[in-house]
Amino acid sequence: MLLEEVHAGDRLSGAAARGDVQEVRRLLHSELVHPDVLNRFGKTALQVMMFGSPTIALELLKQGASPNVQDASGTTPAHDAARTGFLDTLKVLVEHGADVNAPDGTGALPIHLAVREGHTSVVSFLATESDLHHRDATGLTPLELARGRGAQELMDILQRHTVAPL
């Protein structure tokens, strides 16, 4: 990787992590930095962005950022948005092709992470998009995970969307 590419990746990732929409736009449009350029840590701007800023996600995705880029542990931006509870950002990612059925390195789908963290609105959104029969590395479906946590509201949401396998 060229030093200037790393520098561009650091600048774009830094602006995305700070939530600096204007700088992200300037780098993408004026300096023509590729949205998937890697920073010095091997991450893209979409992977390190401020997840509370769906505008940043939208700008990067409109310019061609991959919504399904995985880090070394298999985590995608959708996993991060679900884990941290940023529903608006997650919706933008899904609208631009994020695969909510891609497991991370622990076998967890984004919905598993949302259940684990107790993000009701994220679980409700993902319940219609996710494979609710998928088991993580511990062998649990999202519903079983919610049951183990004693999270009745999450269990109710998941039960409404779970169809018995044939």
Curated annotation (Swiss-Prot):
Belongs to the CDKN2 cyclin-dependent kinase inhibitor family. This is Cyclin-dependent kinase 4 inhibitor D. Its main location: nucleus. GO terms for biological process: autophagic cell death; DNA synthesis involved in DNA repair; negative regulation of cell cycle G1/S phase transition; negative regulation of cell growth; negative regulation of cell population proliferation; negative regulation of intrinsic apoptotic signaling pathway in response to DNA damage; regulation of G1/S transition of mitotic cell cycle; response to retinoic acid. It is found in: Nucleus; Cytoplasm. ANK repeats lie at residues 41-69, 73-102, 106-135, 138-166. Gene3D superfamilies: Ankyrin repeat-containing domain. GO terms for cellular component: cyclin D2-CDK4 complex; cytosol; nucleoplasm; nucleus. InterPro entries: Ank_Repeat/CDKN_Inhibitor (IPR050776), Ankyrin_rpt (IPR002110), Ankyrin_rpt-contain_sf (IPR036770). Interacts with CDK6. It comes from the Eukaryota. It comes from Bos taurus (Bovine). The modification N-acetylmethionine is found at M1.
